[in-house]
Amino acid sequence: MMLLSSSYSGGQFPGVSPLGTRPKRSTTVVPLPVVTRATAGGVRNNLEVVGNAGTLQGMDIDELRVIVRKQLQGVELSPSSYDTAWVAMVPVQGSPQSPCFPQCVEWILQNQQEDGSWGHSAGPSGEVNKDILLSTLACVLALNTWNVGQDHIRRGLSFIGRNFSVAIDGQCAAPVGFNITFSGMLHLAIGMGLKFPVMETDIDSIFRLREVEFERDAGGTASARKAFMAYVSEGLGREQDWDHVMAYQRKNGSLFNSPSTTAASAIHSCNDRALDYLVSLTSKLGGPVPAIHPDKVYSQLCMVDTLEKMGISSDFACDIRDILDMTYSCWMQDEEEIMLDMATCAKAFRLLRMHGYDVSSEGMARFAERSSFDDSIHAYLNDTKPLLELYKSSQLHFLEEDLILENISSWSAKLLKQQLSSNKIMKSLMPEVEYALKYPLYSTVDALEHRGNIERFNVNGFQRPKSGYCGSGADKEILALAVDKFHYNQSVYQQELRYLESWVAEFGLDELKFARVIPLQSLLSALVPLFPAELSDARIAFSQNCMLTTMVDDFFDGGGSMEEMVNFVALIDEWDNHGEIGFCSNNVEIMFNAIYNTTKRNCAKAALVQNRCVMDHIAKQWQVMVRAMKTEAEWAASRHIPATMEEYMSVGEPSFALGPIVPLSAYLLGEELPEEAVRSPEYGQLLRHASAVGRLLNDVMTYEKEVLTWTPNSVLLQALAAARGGGESPTPPSPACAEAARGEVRRAIQASWRDLHRLVFRDDDGSSIVPRACRELFWGTAKVANVFYQEVDGYTPKAMRGMANAVILDPLHLQQ
């Protein structure tokens, strides 16, 4: 039995219902606020945040959204002093005494820091890092190349001298290829006659680090090493085989979309296409250049991904749709900016599929084999991020035999595990990798993910190859918005929890000693598919029905006598005419009154949304469910084992109880769910696959307990069929046979996940009659089963309580 919950009463829950049977007793019921899209969206002002977003305290929330939206619509990377310096060193062809890009030289002259450096620090304290040293040395070289800015050069050399120890310190984070690029430029500077105020032994130490890098046995293959050496070509200068390097040139004329590498090739090989790329780049951007160009698609996708991870993407839905439309167009045109870059391609594929775009896995074919990684720069650097992106994207396969995604999933998971075990993953990235491997796409709890991402969020940006640290340009604003929304959501959830507790007391559900009635975990189960605050009505209905169906399941699973079961089924069958039946026990009366009155109230709310009565549909779902549970109770009493899986699942799917839970919440999502959609084959498939996932997951986890009582279970059926044993035989299957049967059932679960995934995330091109929000509710509901049945049956584990507390009750712990 799946343990879910969610439904919400928009206002005070009356002590006496005008819609049905009078509740057993009257209590004081906690009122709830009316949560609308406007209030959930955040008309709250004067933001109060702590931790590393504290500088934004008091800002209006709409002002923050404007800043984030502006950055999202036109993501611009910070200028890279390092790359600008290399572009500044390119001479005019045929006139080596003149800079080809004087605007870059001028920008360098105008942007030296007071301490003599160029570049940006990696943290709030402004400490010197290797990126600043690298950028400063490059800018000094650029100015000295054209014999300008002598005072700038002197101050730059002085800064490098004062901080030279940073360059030697192996504990300091370094841009990619630092030991090659810094030493190469140092050699070039010394050749120009520049004097560094440092000891000769320190300079020798830098050159020794260069030799160590050349001799280092890094990751990947020989091809990966060649690609890496091409990428840091500016640090090799005349030592580089520039004809070999040009094999990496892209259609836009660049090398790796890197201005610095491309500028070095223009200097040493006089390549016209490289020069054309730089001309185009500087004409677009003016004086400075970024570390990577073009990079708009990746940067925007990263920001979209960040907004989703932080739980605030709904505030920017239109902007995100525009970005994904543009990305889809680029995907369909097979543009290099997306298709050649591992991380960009994987992230684009994942986000497009998750948002309903029709993208084929053929676009990922170039990464189907592990060699695509082993031969890349990423392998040489043991770069985890592209690997993680590939693994995440591989989870989105709709077909049973999608060999491309299956291969990617297999080899990327293996490599990620190897990196974890060998401690090759950055500490800041380790929690995300561990989480991705432990919790597949269908096992995640969005609200819990949001919390973890908020608490780990780094407002100082992230490190990029050769360019130091970059951010979205709105990191502090993103964090402030996320903290504000999480706090607001928690306040809504906490009011809902108090309401659910008062609802339990009102109907006397706490008097049912046989029943698991746990509001906190029930609300958690509702939050998996329904975490936005404005979905409060749907969430409360979901929570209530989780508790009610769990109560009924416990009743049929030993909590009631056969006489009570027959009486209860008759009451549900008669529904509005239940008065003609009567109650044979106090427990039956409590159960029926709670179900009947709660359903009446929620259906009254749903009628306001749907402009029609939905009671008959919901009552029918209750009738189907209790009949199935009664059949299971009769099977257990007679020790009957169904002859086939078809016979078993015809009862097992409806007894999993999604029928009363999902439809009512779907009616309360705030948009029309037409009757023809509910009656459509598509809706039936969604319900069937979600129910199958839950039922089979439950069976896998409860087999050991149920085989002892000879309770029907899909694992038991598979094991008996494999052993050719009699269905009525009380002899349990052997452990080996049972494990093989578990494997068969797990494969059936995966098949249902794929079918459900395909139905839910299909392209919104009009081919689906069921609204997207309703389809996603089925997906989220199936996820609840996976979350709750990962280890043991149902609500009891301490981990479940901890998860519920983290989402609903516990305050955030932000980085300081």
From Swiss-Prot:
Q: What does this protein do?
A: Catalyzes the conversion of syn-copalyl diphosphate to stemodene.
Taxonomic source organism = Oryza sativa subsp. indica
Q: Which residues bind Mg(2+) 1?
A: 553, 557
Q: How is the cofactor bound?
A: Binds 3 Mg(2+) ions per subunit.
Give the protein name, as stated in the record: Stemod-13(17)-ene synthase
Q: What is known of its domains?
A: The Asp-Asp-Xaa-Xaa-Asp/Glu (DDXXD/E) motif is important for the catalytic activity, presumably through binding to Mg(2+).
Catalysed transformations (reactions): 9alpha-copalyl diphosphate = stemod-13(17)-ene + diphosphate
Which portions of the sequence form the region Disordered? 1-24
Q: Which GO terms describe its molecular function?
A: magnesium ion binding; syn-stemod-13(17)-ene synthase activity; terpene synthase activity
For Mg(2+) 2, which residues are the binding ones? Answer: 553, 557
| This enzyme's EC code(s) | 4.2.3.34
Where is composition skewed (Polar residues) in this entry?
1-10
